Amino acid sequence: HPIVTEVLEESSESMDIIGFNYLTGRHLLEGELHPNKCVLGTETFPADIARLWKVVNSSKRVLGDFTWTGYDYLGEAGCGIFYYDGKSNFGSNYPDRTAYIGDIDLAGYRRPVSFLREIVYGLRKEPYIAVERVDKYGKKCSKTPWMLKDNIASWTWRGYEGKPAVVDVYSDAQEVELFLNGKSLGRKAAGEAHGFTASFETCYEPGVLEAVNYQDGRETGRHLLCTAGEEVLLHVAADQKELRADGEDLCFLTMHLCDAKGTPDLYGKRRIHIEVEGAGTLAAFGNADPQSVESYDAPCWETYDGYALAAVRAGGEKGEISVTIWMEGQEEQRQKILIPVNEK
C-alpha cells in the first residue's frame, strides 16, 4: 500500500539490508523500489516457508528467511497450542507454559515442520510422513499463523484401529505414492506447485506406512513409519562421553520410548525417574509438553510424544558422574550411565 511505502521509506533508505517481520508481501516490492539494496525476512510464519523460499530463489535481492521460531521456548504461552476445547490462543489459558511453535520442541525433538523446511531448502530428497493425530480426527481446533498442522511422525495409535486417519507427506518430487501394508493408497501430486505436501485419507491399521517419491516416473526416495510393538522399552542416549570440571559443562540425555526392535513409540506414555550421583548434578529434566505443570528440576517426568530430555552438569572437581534412569513400574530395568569428569 502506498501509505505503508511512505511510512517505511525513511528507514529503508538508511539501511543496506532491509529486514521485515511478517511483512512478506513487501519482499519483492522493496527490491524493486530500492534496486541497490537487499531484503531479508527477519521473522516469518513457519507455515509460509514454501511460498517464501520461492521468493528467495526467484530474486537476487531477497537474501533469505528467518522463521519464528527454530527452538521452542517458555513464554508467549499458547501461541502454537492446538486447542480442541474452544479455547483461544494467547488467551492466558492455564496451564499453558511454552509457545509451542518451534521447529524443534523443548526436548530437542524435531517436529514435522522442520522436515518440511529441510525439503523446501533442497536438503532432503526423501519424502517425510507426518500423521495428523488420529485421536483428534474430525475435531475442530484453534489455530494461529504460527501453526502448521497437529501431526507427528507416528503410525502407532493403540485403540484407534479402523478409525479415519489423515496422512501428510512432505516431498519435493512431482508425485508421491503412499502404501499401507503393501497396498497402494494412490498417487498424488507434490513438489513446489503443491506446497511440497500431499495429503491422503485412510483408516488406521497397524503395520507399515510407506511413502515413495517419483520424479519423471522414476523413484527418487522413500520414507516409512512402523507400528511399535506392545512391549515398551526406554532408549537413552548421551550427547557427551566426558565433561570438563568447570561447573558449567553439560551432558544432554535424550530418552524415548520404543519397542524391542527400536521402533519409536510416540503414542506411549511412561513416567521416567532419574538419579544423579558423584561429580555432577541434575541441571534440568523435562519434556516438550506445552501445558505441563511439573518442575524442570524434578527427578521424575512423564514422556510427551514418547520423549523426555535431561541435562546433567559437571561440578568443579574431577571424578565420575553416575546417572541412573528407569521407567516407573520397571525398576528392575534400570540403566546406568557413567560420565567421566576431567580437568578443565
Task: Indicate residue ranges for each PLM-predicted region.
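Short, hydrophobic beta-strand segments
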Residues: 198-204, 297-316
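Short acidic/polar inter-strand loop motif in beta-rich domains
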Residues: 215-220, 328-336
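Substrate-binding clefts and catalytic carboxylate motifs of secreted carbohydrate-active enzymes
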Residues: 1, 9-248, 260-265
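Short aromatic-acidic-glycine turn motif
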Residues: 188-190, 232-235, 275-291
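Extended low-complexity, serine/threonine- and proline-enriched intrinsically disordered segments
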Residues: 175-183, 269-283
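Short beta-strand elements
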Residues: 222-229, 333-344
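Exposed beta-strand face motif in extracellular beta-rich ectodomains
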Residues: 205-209, 251, 317-321
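Conserved structural position at the C-terminal beta-strand
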Residues: 213, 257, 325-327
